[in-house]
Design a protein with these regions (language model features):
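Residue-level signal for inorganic ion chemistry
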Residues: 33, 60, 86, 104, ...
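Acidic, Mg2+-coordinating active-site environments of NTP-dependent enzymes
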Residues: 27-28, 95-99, 120-200
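A generic structural signal for short, well-ordered alpha-helical segments in conserved domains
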Residues: 43-47, 90, 201
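Short beta-strand-centered segment that lines the nucleotide-binding/catalytic pocket of NTP-utilizing
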Residues: 54-68, 106
Length: 201
């Protein structure tokens, strides 16, 4: 009951924030990144790739945000900012003239409607492991929540090992697969998991 009320509160906040700031996500090409691990790294990699290509881009992670070239310590460190702050950042980026936004998206952010109203052009899934079950109850529920981002996006980017479990929910969707086994390469980032992050980016 309490959880349902919290969800309703966050949804109402998201609706009001979108209206107040004029649905700023519609003015941006938004790339959402979700997963259990590697969200912040992959979000940052995509941001740096687009920035290096001369594209006007901002990003928001659970650690910090870079909006219109200025860095902000969000202080969230766990989940997405509340909808009000999220929409405010999107509006600042759009008003600055940025064309792209890279957004780290947590399962709590999805289930609590914090990213409601944002039209995702691309949804990226890094990986899904057995975490956050205290909130989601079961792995199936957790995985399904993560897939919400990909099902809402125009293009879904997902690893081959997760695609089989997600195939039904992504039916009819444009899907881009990545597989570190088929694309061997070297990176200065340590750990095999960072190879997955690079491929996802």
């Amino acid at each position: 009951m309490i959880r349902s009320l919290k969800g309703l509160y966050h949804l109402l906040e998201a609706i009001v924030a979108n209206i107040w700031f004029g649905f700023p996500g519609k003015s941006l090409t938004v790339i959402g990144v979700t997963g259990t691990d590697g969200k912040t790294t992959t979000t940052t990699l995509i941001y740096e790739i687009l920035k290096s290509a001369g594209i006007g881009v901002s990003m928001i992670t659970s650690i910090h945000a870079v909006i219109a070239g200025k860095s902000y310590d969000t202080g969230f460190h766990v989940t997405n900012p509340r909808s009000w702050w999220l929409q405010k950042y999107l509006r600042q980026a759009a008003d600055h003239g940025d064309t792209h936004m890279v957004l780290e998206v947590t399962s709590h952010g999805l289930s609590q409607y914090r990213v409601w109203g944002i039209p995702f052009a691309v949804g990226v899934l890094t990986n899904v492991t057995h975490e956050h079950l205290d909130w989601h109850g079961t792995f199936e529920s957790y995985f399904s929540t993560k897939l919400t981002l990909l099902s809402q996006a125009n293009i879904a980017v997902i690893g081959t090992e997760d695609f089989e479990k997600a195939k039904q929910k992504l039916e009819g969707k444009e899907v881009k697969l990545y597989d570190s086994a088929n694309y061997p390469f070297h990176t200065k980032l340590l750990g095999d998991f960072n190879k997955r992050n690079c491929l996802a980016a």
